[in-house]
């Protein structure tokens, strides 16, 4: 049954990722990928903190959200491909801005999620 929950979570995450991708319409800064990855980082941090209080009794739901939903929502491979595309087009400032923003804010939002989740549990 766990696989069904992961499948459903993955389908929902993929659908949301697809909808967010429409933010990338101008061919410039890939805001859709950034939004998807930063949202995923925050939710992962939040769920990590809530695991002790809530998800210890619901491990299948945790797998559905983390492995399924967040696994499909976030996209490290697209992020890497976009960085290579920027490099190939000599968009070095945009490349650095995107990479630094993604990593720094990803870590920061994951941390905020952990702290917020700790306060809720």
UniProtKB/Swiss-Prot annotation:
Domain of life from the UniProt record: Bacteria
Compartments, as annotated in UniProt: Cell membrane
GO molecular function annotations of the record: fluoride channel activity; metal ion binding
A GO term from the CC aspect: plasma membrane
Annotated membrane topology: Multi-pass membrane protein
Residue spans crossing the bilayer: 3-23, 35-55, 64-84, 92-112
Major subcellular site: membrane
Residues bound to Na(+): 71, 74
Coiled coil: none
Function: Fluoride-specific ion channel. Important for reducing fluoride concentration in the cell, thus reducing its toxicity.
Family: Belongs to the fluoride channel Fluc/FEX (TC 1.A.43) family.
Descriptive protein name: Fluoride-specific ion channel FluC 1
Gene name of the encoded protein: fluC1
